[in-house]
Amino acid sequence: MIFDKTMLARYFIMGTQDVADEAEFLRILNQALRSGITLFQYREKGQGALVGQKKLQLAKQVRALTAQYHVPLVIDDDMALAHAIAADGIHFGQDDGRPVDNIKQSGNLFVGVSVSNQQEYQRIAHVAGIDHIGVGPIFATTSKSDAKPPIGISGLSQLIRIAHHPIVAIGGIQRDNLSKVLSTGVDGAAVISMISQSGDIQKTLADWRNRT
């Protein structure tokens, strides 16, 4: 799939480790897809995450659901899985191997890479084949146990000024700070708990759409 930066507008990330069980995962994903997310990243990582055949079987269900709603699907740091289920994109962190090697294996997948500061961005800025950058954490987050120190709105703004890639902000983004993030002119925001722990996903996403 050809990447378009408008995909980054309302980016939802989730794995089974973020919710009670697989049934809850699928219920939340279905609601989020119906309610207007523009991109979904399947991220199984951390304590309690699925592996092997269980991960593959759930990923196939995720692929079917995202295809039904015409929402692009990104796989986090699992190239074999991304190709096996015909995902649309792949995402890598700073510790997920060399970007050049990952891009060589990506085929027709679009590629996202995480950075948390200007130095990390400058190291990958001129690597061909990167379609967008995930910048963060913007705020403190409990969704990722290995999260780096938050860079704040000022850190995000600085990266937006120097970057020549589309940027999606991530990390600790909730309804009460979303407007501050969007005011930087960033291409989109990526969230986990803002949707996965929402008591009303449809209302949460309607509010998000109204701010953009």
Curated annotation (Swiss-Prot):
One of its GO terms (molecular function) is magnesium ion binding. GO terms for cellular component: cytoplasm. It comes from the Bacteria. Binds 1 Mg(2+) ion per subunit. Pathway: Cofactor biosynthesis; thiamine diphosphate biosynthesis; thiamine phosphate from 4-amino-2-methyl-5-diphosphomethylpyrimidine and 4-methyl-5-(2-phosphoethyl)-thiazole: step 1/1. 2-[(2R,5Z)-2-carboxy-4-methylthiazol-5(2H)-ylidene]ethyl phosphate binds at T141, T142, S143, G172, I192, S193. Keywords: Magnesium, Metal-binding, Thiamine biosynthesis, Transferase. SUPFAM superfamilies: Thiamin phosphate synthase (SSF51391). 4-amino-2-methyl-5-(diphosphooxymethyl)pyrimidine binds at Q41, Y42, R43, E44, K45, D76, S114, K144. Its cofactor is Mg(2+). Mg(2+) binds at D77, D96. Its EC number is 2.5.1.3. It is an enzyme of class 2 (transferase). GO terms for biological process: thiamine biosynthetic process; thiamine diphosphate biosynthetic process. Pfam families: TMP-TENI. It catalyses: 2-[(2R,5Z)-2-carboxy-4-methylthiazol-5(2H)-ylidene]ethyl phosphate + 4-amino-2-methyl-5-(diphosphooxymethyl)pyrimidine + 2 H(+) = thiamine phosphate + CO2 + diphosphate; 2-(2-carboxy-4-methylthiazol-5-yl)ethyl phosphate + 4-amino-2-methyl-5-(diphosphooxymethyl)pyrimidine + 2 H(+) = thiamine phosphate + CO2 + diphosphate; 4-methyl-5-(2-phosphooxyethyl)-thiazole + 4-amino-2-methyl-5-(diphosphooxymethyl)pyrimidine + H(+) = thiamine phosphate + diphosphate. The keyword Metal-binding applies. Condenses 4-methyl-5-(beta-hydroxyethyl)thiazole monophosphate (THZ-P) and 2-methyl-4-amino-5-hydroxymethyl pyrimidine pyrophosphate (HMP-PP) to form thiamine monophosphate (TMP). PANTHER family: THIAMINE-PHOSPHATE PYROPHOSPHORYLASE, THIAMINE-PHOSPHATE SYNTHASE. Belongs to the thiamine-phosphate synthase family. NCBIfam families: thiE. This is Thiamine-phosphate synthase.
